[in-house]
Amino acid sequence: MRRIYFYAKALTVILLTLPLTAGAISDPVTVCILDSGCNLPDIQGRNYLDGTQDLTDPEGHGTYVYELLKETAPEAELYMLKCFDSSTAIIQAVYDAVDVYDADIINMSWTLNQDSEELHEAICYAAKQNVLLVAAAGNLSLSTPLGSQVYPASWEEVIGVSGVDLNAQGEPVSSLWYLQSDAVFVSANGNYQGEKGSSFAAPRISGILAGYLDRTSEEKHTQSYAEEYLKSIAVDAGHPGYDTVFGWGYVKNTAG
């Protein structure tokens, strides 16, 4: 089993909070959160570590991610699939997000530092069903040095999100925590409740995409359309055009 690294100390992404309104999807947009659990009441989901409904969050990480997604996409239907940190549980959770929960979006606020063929197969399965896959692009650490490839964000089927800091004017700024990886597609605010990391940027992007799906026709519910949408609302930051810190830009979000 490979070690999974949470990102509660590092980056930011630009997000735009867009309220969910009546749109092309009659049912609420469904977002499955693959994480450490959630300590809030009345949470739907499953514990993939022991097959129970115990969603208690010993890390606190999944609770923060859930809260951020709820703030950014208040009308979305959220499911917590508790699966840390077992690679077998994570893989099954990806498949069930598609087949059991009928997910529109899967949020993965974590990284692996090594490729996994089995997980990639599950990710590809979800992508073929037009499920949007969003993942943290990682934080700089001794185990993930500058420019490291991190997964699942590095796979082309996944939208990788970096977390960035903001200055006093609310503008994105550089940070010593940036991993600087080509896994980054866009960036968003990575600060929440005194913690920092790309873990907290990813759910902001997932929430924005929930709003996008709610307002658009089903033919536009694909990764390519979603990525073009994110690029259209992102504000260029860092070097002109694409760079490995901010990706295609910072997506601004007021939540958090």
Residue map of PLM features:
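Active-site core segment of subtilase-fold serine proteases
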Residues: A24-E77, Q92, D96-A103, N167, ...
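Extracellular S/T/G-rich loop segment that most often corresponds to the catalytic His/Ser-adjacent loop
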Residues: D27-D35, V150-D214, Y250-N253
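Active-site alpha-helical elements of protease catalytic centers
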Residues: T52-K82, Q193-R215
